[in-house]
């Protein structure tokens, strides 16, 4: 999938009129039928199945909030298989509307910006649930999982649940990540996919529970490990390309601690600095003599610890020359030139376009980062911005910095929150 783009000067892009808010439309049944038919083609090879738990507690025509984990591009087709012919709106990022705004609205999509405060989104969700009596599907993680475990959820999601006061349904998939992990260069594997569809809470239960209780329940529900699931269920993934791109995720060698010198190719993960090599076996384990890690999420968690130490020591810093695309409307992604992206304990600083662009974003702007691999087949991307404009930054050296930057944003946010919290006496 690609995105419509244009080359335009920075001044002209920033002078473009911003789209006015429009209330979301009730999904057109005919289009949802088309999506359902198309989803059959993708789901048939996965032998998709799902189980429901407690769904009888929800009335047949009662609108609900559907919360689904975000594992791969197949997620929306899974939702169509589960809920069709029930009509539901979908909370979608604004980039998905580029070049197809009307179509997305007719499907029932509600636009929002990833990891940018958006009170309008809450009003739109409330409008669909209360006024249009239409369910709303939302991916609370917002971003795809990098390592097959849950992406951190925004704190106080319970406040949103309390405000909407409708039944909450969760959809947790298994196998969708393993079939098409984000790092694996869009190469699909032969993996069966299943899902658990659960009534997490009725409207009455949402009303009775506290925000903290709802947050805790969500954290428990969105707690999973796709690699562990593969291992425990002895799921065989024997494609010869299964380690392709794994260096995007595991960028730091645990033996020599060199960063950016690891290559994931075929079934091997090799450090070009010290020569240490790991094999990714058919059950998702890493194998090597004197292996530091055998479980991919453990390696990823170790990298998180290393970044935490760098932040605490004041030694962490990212500085990259980047190609810059800006999104200010749904007509196109606008290429405006090049610049420098810096990230340190003070947050992000993006400069470029011959000195015309100078944007800063503090470390408390968001709990995580909008980052992606091979975004719309362009390249690995780091996205920052606000409601006025989103800045898509593509490292010119194609280095493996996306995962590290996301980890750094998450750990820096936690550190700043801790320091900001009042000290109890």
Language-model features: locations:
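Soluble, non-transmembrane catalytic domains of enzymes that act on hydrophobic metabolites at membranes
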Residues: 1-10, 351-353
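Helix-enriched interaction subdomains in cytosolic or periplasmic regions
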Residues: 17-38
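Soluble catalytic domains of membrane acyltransferases
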Residues: 27, 31, 43-216, 232-233, ...
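Short, structured interface segments
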Residues: 214-228
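Cys/His-rich short segments
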Residues: 238-291
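Structural motif
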Residues: 265, 344-346, 378
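Long, charge-rich boundary regions
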Residues: 277-358
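Acidic, Ser/Thr- and proline-rich intrinsically disordered linker/docking segments
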Residues: 365-425
């Amino acid at each position: 999938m690609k995105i419509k783009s244009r080359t335009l000067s920075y001044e002209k892009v920033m002078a473009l009129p911003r789209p006015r808010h429009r209330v979301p439309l009730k999904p057109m049944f005919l289009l949802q039928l088309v999506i359902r038919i198309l989803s059959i083609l993708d789901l048939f090879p996965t032998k998709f199945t799902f189980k429901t738990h407690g769904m009888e507690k929800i009335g047949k025509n009662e609108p609900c909030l559907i919360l689904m984990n975000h594992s791969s591009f197949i997620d929306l087709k899974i939702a169509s298989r589960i809920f069709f012919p029930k009509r539901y709106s979908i909370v979608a990022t604004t980039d998905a509307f580029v070049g197809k705004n009307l179509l997305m609205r007719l499907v029932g999509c509600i636009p929002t910006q990833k990891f940018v405060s958006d009170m309008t989104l809450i009003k739109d969700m409330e409008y669909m649930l209360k006024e249009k009596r239409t369910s709303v599907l939302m991916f609370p993680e917002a971003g795809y999982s990098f390592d097959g475990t849950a992406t951190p959820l925004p704190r106080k999601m319970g406040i949103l649940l309390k405000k909407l006061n409708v039944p909450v349904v969760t959809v947790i998939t298994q196998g969708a990540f393993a079939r098409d992990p984000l790092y694996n260069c869009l190469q699909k594997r032969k993996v069966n996919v299943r899902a658990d569809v659960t009534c997490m809470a009725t409207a009455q239960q949402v009303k009775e529970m506290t925000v903290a209780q709802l947050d805790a329940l969500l954290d428990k529900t969105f707690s999973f490990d796709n690699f562990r699931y593969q291992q425990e269920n002895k799921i065989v993934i024997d494609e010869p390309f299964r380690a392709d791109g794994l260096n995007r995720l595991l960028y730091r060698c645990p033996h020599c601690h060199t960063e950016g010198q690891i290559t994931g190719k075929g079934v091997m993960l090799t450090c070009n600095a010290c020569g240490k090599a790991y094999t990714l076996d058919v059950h998702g384990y890493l194998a090597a003599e004197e292996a530091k890690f055998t479980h991919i999420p453990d390696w990823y968690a170790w990298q998180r610890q290393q970044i935490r130490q760098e932040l605490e020591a004041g030694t962490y810093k990212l500085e990259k020359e980047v190609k810059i695309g800006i999104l200010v409307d749904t007509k196109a992604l606008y290429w405006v030139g090049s610049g420098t992206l810096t990230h340190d304990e003070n947050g992000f600083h993006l400069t470029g376009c011959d000195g015309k662009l100078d944007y800063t974003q503090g470390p408390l702007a968001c709990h995580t980062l909008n980052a992606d691999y091979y975004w719309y087949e362009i390249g690995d991307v780091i996205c920052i911005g606000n409601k006025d404009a989103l800045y898509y930054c593509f490292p010119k050296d194609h280095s493996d910095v996306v995962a590290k930057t996301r980890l750094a944003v998450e750990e820096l946010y936690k550190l700043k929150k801790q320091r900001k919290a009042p000290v109890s006496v």
